[in-house]
Amino acid sequence: MDYKKLFDLSGKICVVTGGTGYLGSENVKILKDFGGTVVCADLREAEDRWEKNEDKAYDMFVKCDVSSTESIKACFAAVAEKYGRIDVLVNCACYGAGYGKGSQLEFMDDETFNKGVDGALGTAFRGMREVVPYMKEKGGSIINYCSMYGLVSPDLRIYGDNPQKQPPNYGAGKAGVAQITRYAACSLSEYGIRVNAVTPGPFPNPKNQDDVRFNQALANKTMLGRFGQSYEMAGAVLLLASDASSFMTGSNIVVDGGWTAW
């Protein structure tokens, strides 16, 4: 066994939804660095996500709205038209509803609740469903993004009036992602399609770190006493995309600084 080749993605066609986002862009970069042909799928090609004078870390950009089945279908069809198949799908994109004042359970209406659940869970479901035809022949790897709040409740005491206060629909949706990952792993195993999840802990975007009190309280909830840096999620994604995880399916890798372990 040549262990150096276990993480080699040469010849793999990798699609990352939400690929211009804070965590998604790191997924794109590491998959490209390890030899993958990377397709960035997002609502817009955000130039400010890439450092000055740095070449884009992807081979193709496709506009994709993960709230729309037709948009996802068109995205995957465009990738297949150019490359012939899809080997890896990273379902990173999601959207929320009900943050801030509308986050309290007793005041949330049905429409807002359902929209938030769809933004967390429906996005992963649609991505998995629509990519299957492109992976059936040769197998593949699907990686879903869960959340620590799909495993444990947020400690609402630390949020106060912070606009990032977690609504109930987000955690409910992400808990669903963990379960549908296990279900899909079983359902798609006959095609050689592996389905796993990664669960980030606190990885706040630096643009949202103005509240010093809240940031410190959030960091103190981890065993390591700090936030995660965006690149620290990338290794788990690389593992699951590569042959290094060839005997892994239905798994959920938690990268949370110990948040959910105590």
Where are these regions (language model features)?
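Short C-terminal tail/terminal secondary-structure segment
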Residues: D2-L6, L238, T249-W262
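Conserved NAD(P)H cofactor-binding loop of Rossmann-fold oxidoreductase domains
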Residues: C92-G100, G258
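Catalytic loop of short-chain dehydrogenase/reductase
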Residues: Y95-G96, D110, I143-G176, T181-E190, ...
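Catalytic Tyr-X3-Lys loop
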Residues: E106-R126, I143, Y170-A172, V177, ...
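A conserved structural motif in NAD(P)-dependent oxidoreductases
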Residues: T222-M233, A244
